[in-house]
């Protein structure tokens, strides 16, 4: 929140960051908190898809080495010489014995799938959220609408494009 002063003798008045001069009531929620998690309402479909694709690629590329170590630790026939005490210890041992790039093997294929999948999921979620929020709760955000959107967009993402019935049978 920023304070602006008028001329001499005028009272200082609070002005919200978004330009609205309404009194915020002095609550604990500051004016910029909504902007942190939401894209602008004028954001296009391509903006939502780009944001989703970048988030998915980043998430998978960061967690892929940990997932590959976890999969190796859970495998039914692990290497008898492998004595892993923790995920970090296993990652260190794999890098030392098999090379630096071993935990990243297959990451390129994962990223090629994660980008389009997360782009579609994010775009579906944001579009349905905007539509259902208008139906359920005219002022602001509806938790019910967001939950419904989350569930339906997740089902839609993993279902084949031609036949929606297998994905919706799990509802």
UniProtKB/Swiss-Prot annotation:
Q: Name one GO molecular function term.
A: ferrous iron transmembrane transporter activity
Q: Where in the cell is it found?
A: Mitochondrion inner membrane
Q: State the gene name recorded for this protein.
A: SLC25A37
Report the superkingdom from the record: Eukaryota
GO terms under biological process:
iron import into the mitochondrion; positive regulation of hemoglobin biosynthetic process
Work out whether the entry's keyword set contains Electron transport: no
What's its job?
Mitochondrial iron transporter that specifically mediates iron uptake in developing erythroid cells, thereby playing an essential role in heme biosynthesis.
UniProt-listed PROSITE patterns: SOLCAR (PS50920)
**What keywords were assigned to this record?**
Ion transport, Iron, Iron transport, Membrane, Mitochondrion, Mitochondrion inner membrane, Transmembrane, Transmembrane helix, Transport
Fetch the InterPro entries from UniProt. Answer: Mitochondrial_sb/sol_carrier, Mt_carrier_dom_sf
Name the membrane topology term: Multi-pass membrane protein
UniProt record similarity statement: Belongs to the mitochondrial carrier (TC 2.A.29) family.
The UniProt annotation puts the region (Disordered) at 1-40
Q: Which reaction(s) does its UniProt entry say it catalyses?
A: Fe(2+)(in) = Fe(2+)(out)
| Subunit note | Interacts with ACB10; this interaction stabilizes SLC25A37 and enhances the function of SLC25A37 to import mitochondrial iron during erythroid differentiation.
* Organism listed in the record: Bos taurus (Bovine)
Record-given protein name:
Mitoferrin-1
Where do the Solcar repeats start and stop?
A: 43-131
- Give TM regions: 45-64, 105-125, 143-163
GO cellular component terms given for this protein: mitochondrial inner membrane; mitochondrial membrane; mitochondrion
